Amino acid sequence: MAFNMKNRHLLSLVHHTEREIKYLLDLSRDLKRAKYAGTEQQKLKGKNIALIFEKTSTRTRCAFEVAAYDQGAQVTYIDPNSSQIGHKESMKDTARVLGRMYDGIEYRGFKQSIVQELADYAGVPVFNGLTDEFHPTQMLADVLTMIEHCDKPLSEISYVYIGDARNNMGNSLLLIGAKLGMDVRICGPKALLPEANLVEMCEKFAKESGARITVTEDIDKAVKGVDFIHTDVWVSMGEPLETWGERIKLLLPYQVTPELMKRTGNPKVKFMHCLPAFHNSETKVGRQIAEKYPELANGIEVTEEVFESPMNIAFEQAENRMHTIKAVMVASLA
């Protein structure tokens, strides 16, 4: 069946087919090779892209900006302090204004309904740079990274997301694995597993793709034989430190340690993280947590020993944000 990625939104990957996702991954690989070889051709000359950031960002902003510049496009960075968005002007009206000035819009913020509203009213492609529910550009980068670090066919690659699995990373890793026919495992305390309706939807996708889905509290079952272990921060930075106690108590058994990596039984297992990671007490937040919870001085969701080991491929993963975001924009806007 033919498909056309021109003018397509990227909101969650729910509505992308397996073939379309694989096309974006192949294009990402090709664009990455061209950049390294110095043979990249600019496909987005004359294009203007708005970058709306209601949440702070390092990787997503840099990835969108560099990807756009590499391809000849111009970007405008918009944050809540420099715009009327949400204060004097609704997102619906903002979408209708920006859609008349820009060829594409990126949004990084809170509710999935906001990026959906942008897509409904902008009249131009909208790209989700992160919402509370989904992180699709990160997923493309994660799968590209796993492909690069594993000799197996995509359908034979196994990975686990471990920790607080009801966030955008847990949701999105479950979704893309189900779409692509992979062996995907989600592991965490029962209270912090993905919502049942999302799991049910992904199980339907898995039947179509041949994916194997495991959602469990059982750490040994989840990590056995996996090729990759993913995790993410345990608590959102907006939450006060005094609320962390119960969450830390729940999640401490799911901390990624050298012992956990060994429990996979796979000497080639790799560690992945969307970053930023709290792997020591060198950051302001890390120091605050270590003062209150001394047992976490050597890392929260992942220990320093794992993070600084050759098992960690999070920085290649971060670089691939740029290549995959570039592919999304080229496929939609070129």
Swiss-Prot record:
Its EC number is 2.1.3.3. One of its GO terms (cellular component) is cytoplasm. NCBIfam families: orni_carb_tr (TIGR00658), PRK01713.1 (NF002470), PRK04284.1 (NF003286). Reversibly catalyzes the transfer of the carbamoyl group from carbamoyl phosphate (CP) to the N(epsilon) atom of ornithine (ORN) to produce L-citrulline. Keywords: Arginine metabolism, Cytoplasm, Transferase. It catalyses: carbamoyl phosphate + L-ornithine = L-citrulline + phosphate + H(+). Pathway: Amino-acid degradation; L-arginine degradation via ADI pathway; carbamoyl phosphate from L-arginine: step 2/2. L-ornithine binds at residues 168, 232, 236-237. Belongs to the aspartate/ornithine carbamoyltransferase superfamily. OTCase family. Carbamoyl phosphate binds at residues 57-60, 84, 108, 135-138, 274-275, 321. It comes from Haemophilus influenzae (strain ATCC 51907 / DSM 11121 / KW20 / Rd). It is found in: Cytoplasm. This is Ornithine carbamoyltransferase, catabolic. It is an enzyme of class 2 (transferase). Its main location: cytoplasm.
